[in-house]
Regions:
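Short, well-ordered alpha-helix to beta-strand connector turns
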Residues: 3, 25, 205, 223-225, ...
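N-terminal Rossmann-like FAD-binding beta1-loop-alpha1 element of flavoenzymes
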Residues: 3-30, 366
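Short, solvent-exposed loop/turn segments at secondary-structure junctions
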Residues: 12-13, 35-36, 99, 153, ...
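Glycine-rich FAD pyrophosphate-binding loop
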Residues: 19-47
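Mid-domain catalytic core of redox enzymes
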Residues: 24, 214-334
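A conserved beta-strand/loop capping segment in the N-terminal third of enzymes
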Residues: 41-51, 59-113, 171-176
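Active-site/ligand-binding neighborhood in enzyme catalytic cores
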Residues: 85-92, 99-226, 230, 235-237
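C-terminal catalytic lobe of FAD-dependent flavoproteins
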Residues: 314-371
């Protein structure tokens, strides 16, 4: 059997391309080296709870085209991301808003809060030289010390004084009682989990799991006219120019015989001493209920740790610095010469994509490629 396209990777980018190609009458084979579909949005049902196996994925977008597209494949619930920050047992609302400022300083009005922040920002004069100075110049010393410093240092594995200022371009400050983390018009979680949504995208398409494309490249390439490759771009070229770096995340999952561990989907641990950056309690993405609306007796939590990425680790976040940017540009030159191969997605383009920008990017590519 000869296919029009082989799609490498069954995450959002690969699954949407495969769906659109099939809709245009093309024959498609999807291969994925994992034992499951859906890439990093993969959810697995355990104890009646859809567990986000590769970290919390909360869909949010202002792009109506993207929302109208993806809601064909899943009904979304009304989940709103309102994380809580835990600093040594003190709980604060995120993002920084009037609840946060009231707890921090006892201020009651937006005017009092604004005055307090302005007064603390004055500590930094001139151009901030590092992330610490940048953060203080945006939100002041108290918020920086309790809610930014420890969390950021755990995430990057480095002191805030050693991190470049540009990492934090802005820290949203809200002088309202609005706990909604995202400023997005559309937001939610697919009811029944992301895996079900990706299954709907791949309906009627041949998928081969546990199949490493790069190990079987010659025989798979012979099966198709074109390849859509969503794996790491440096791996495609055998790392011959060097290895692109990522930040990685490690998860420790635990099932607990209690109905409620922390009362919220996400709690960030913002002190330096707690080794994890946050704890996700998955049942709250779907309001603690199963599909029939029953309360779930158990709960599943994931402790999240940031870790230095080593070759072979799961790549999560591309490192947005000059060295990696220059190396990617060299790989991109090679990729542009690879006729018959389209590189796409977070790993294929070495680019930090949210889910909605991934969808927008693949839909644009489909228009160009499939017409």
């Amino acid at each position: 059997m000869k296919y029009d396209y082989i799609v490498v990777g069954s995450g959002l980018y690969g699954a949407i391309f495969a769906h659109e190609a099939k809709a245009k009458g093309k024959s498609v084979l999807v291969v994925d080296k994992r034992p499951n579909i859906a890439g990093n949005v993969y959810t697995e049902k355990q104890e009646g709870i859809n567990v986000h196996m590769y970290g919390a994925h909360i869909f949010h977008t202002n792009d109506k085209r993207v929302w109208n597209y993806i809601t064909q494949f899943a009904e979304f619930n009304r989940f709103t991301n309102s994380p809580v920050a835990n600093y040594k047992g003190e709980l604060y609302s995120m993002p920084f808003n009037m609840y946060t400022f009231n707890k921090m300083w006892g201020v009651v009005t937006p005017e009092e809060a604004a005055a307090k922040i302005e007064e603390q920002k004055k500590e930094i004069s001139g151009e901030p030289k590092n992330l610490e100075e940048q953060a203080i110049s945006l939100v002041g010393r108290d918020i920086y010390e309790k809610l930014v410093k420890g969390y950021t240092e755990k995430q990057w594995g480095r002191d805030c004084k050693e991190l470049p200022a540009f990492i934090i371009k802005r820290l949203p400050v809200r002088l309202t009682f609005d706990n909604n983390y995202f400023n997005a018009l559309y937001q939610g979680i697919p009811i029944g989990g992301y895996t079900k949504m990706v299954e709907n995208l791949l309906d009627g398409i041949e998928v081969r799991l546990n199949t490493d494309y790069l190990e079987h490249k010659a025989e798979l390439d012979a099966l198709a006219d074109k390849v859509v490759y969503t794996g790491p771009i440096d791996a495609y070229f055998g790392f011959k120019l060097g290895t692109l770096e990522y930040r990685s995340v490690r998860f420790e999952n635990e099932t607990l015989d209690i109905p409620n561990f922390q009362g919220n989907a996400a709690v960030n641990y913002t002190d330096r001493e707690t080794p994890w950056t946050r704890i996700i309690e998955h049942k709250w993405f779907e309001f603690g209920k199963d599909e029939d609306g029953n309360d779930l007796p158990k709960t599943i939590i994931s402790r999240e740790y940031s870790s230095e990425w080593r070759a072979g680790d799961e790549p999560y976040y591309p490192v947005n610095d000059e060295k990696n940017g220059q190396l990617y540009a060299k790989y991109k030159e090679l990729a542009d010469k690879e006729t018959g191969v389209i590189f796409g997605g977070r790993l294929g383009e070495y680019k930090y994509y949210d889910m909605d920008t991934t969808i927008a990017s693949v839909l644009d590519m489909c228009e160009k490629e499939l017409g």
